[in-house]
Amino acid sequence: MSFNLQSSKKLFIFLGKSLFSLLEAMIFALLPKPRKNVAGEIVLITGAGSGLGRLLALQFARLGSVLVLWDINKEGNEETCKMAREAGATRVHAYTCDCSQKEGVYRVADQVKKEVGDVSILINNAGIVTGKKFLDCPDELMEKSFDVNFKAHLWTYKAFLPAMIANDHGHLVCISSSAGLSGVNGLADYCASKFAAFGFAESVFVETFVQKQKGIKTTIVCPFFIKTGMFEGCTTGCPSLLPILEPKYAVEKIVEAILQEKMYLYMPKLLYFMMFLKSFLPLKTGLLIADYLGILHAMDGFVDQKKKL
């Protein structure tokens, strides 16, 4: 009898909390969710020397954040630093760091802690793409993809998460990819690294949830191709439904998701529907849709930036 009462109580609590969370989600779907103030927050952005990382730095500069910029490209990173100051940032710190090297990450992280303070918003943005078919891709390039696109997240989390937990305040941002949701022809190593980054960020979020560390937020971003040069030459078969994203639009959406403490951000919105279809459609139907949207041959025109130099 007592077992039945206990089970019933547990069920009612579960149903009540579930209903409340659904109602809350519906309300915020209709009304704008409040945005948090990031003025004075120490924001670390990896891969800040160009592309998406640079644009993210400029957005946070306008919001009054303290910027910590990491990139392996010293010249590009210093240029971003200069642009951030021109955009209104009063405190900007640029560090040359190869995020693929664990020892280097830990060394520069210690510098940041001593010279700037505890990072409260960590944006793992640094990424590389080889754009080669699996059997054509040298082992060292595949290893480099994993080192930059995934393993760097392990080292930066290890370096900065403890202080966030101690302060019960922090935000972990993973820039994954639509290629971290579904396999793509010509991107085997990239997809694998982005799947890993997604799964890692989600798992650490679950750890913080179970440990009731409510002050630690997570945002996982999965965009389709962005016009930053990284995927130059890539195409889409249906631009009206699945466009290659403009960098300004992508950055605005990413920053908005961070300010609203949104867990998942897929861009464009069609990706949410595509992931839903993938869960139940027959394989052949899914492949037909991918072919229609041009996804199966999106990488055919890819231009390797290293070959251009």
From Swiss-Prot:
Pathway listed: Cofactor metabolism; retinol metabolism
Binding site for substrate: 177
GO BP terms, alphabetized: keratinocyte proliferation; negative regulation of gene expression, epigenetic; negative regulation of transcription by RNA polymerase II; retinal metabolic process; retinol metabolic process
Transmembrane segments: 11-31, 270-290
Protein topology in the membrane: Multi-pass membrane protein
Binding site for NADP(+): 44-68
Top-tier EC class: oxidoreductase
Primary location class: endoplasmic reticulum
Compartment list: Endoplasmic reticulum membrane
A Pfam family the protein falls into: adh_short
The EC number(s) this enzyme carries: 1.1.1.105
InterPro entries cross-referenced by the UniProt entry: NAD(P)-bd_dom_sf, SDR_fam
Tissue: Detected in adult lung. Detected at low levels in adult brain, heart, testis, placenta, cervix, pancreas, uterus, stomach, rectum, small intestine, colon, esophagus, thymus, skin, and skin keratinocyte. Expression is higher in psoriasis lesions relative to unaffected skin from psoriasis patients. Detected in fetal kidney, skin and lung.
Active site annotation, chain numbering: 190
Catalytic activity: all-trans-retinol--[retinol-binding protein] + NAD(+) = all-trans-retinal--[retinol-binding protein] + NADH + H(+)
A GO molecular function held by the record: DNA-binding transcription factor binding
One GO cellular component term noted in the UniProt record for this chain: endoplasmic reticulum membrane
Record's keyword terms, sorted: Endoplasmic reticulum, Membrane, NAD, NADP, Oxidoreductase, Transmembrane, Transmembrane helix
Domain of life: Eukaryota
PANTHER family associated with the record: EPIDERMAL RETINOL DEHYDROGENASE 2 (PTHR24322:SF728), PKSB (PTHR24322)
Function comment: Oxidoreductase with strong preference for NAD. Active in both the oxidative and reductive directions. Oxidizes all-trans-retinol in all-trans-retinaldehyde. No activity was detected with 11-cis-retinol or 11-cis-retinaldehyde as substrates with either NAD(+)/NADH or NADP(+)/NADPH.
Family indicated by similarity: Belongs to the short-chain dehydrogenases/reductases (SDR) family.
Protein name, as recorded: Epidermal retinol dehydrogenase 2
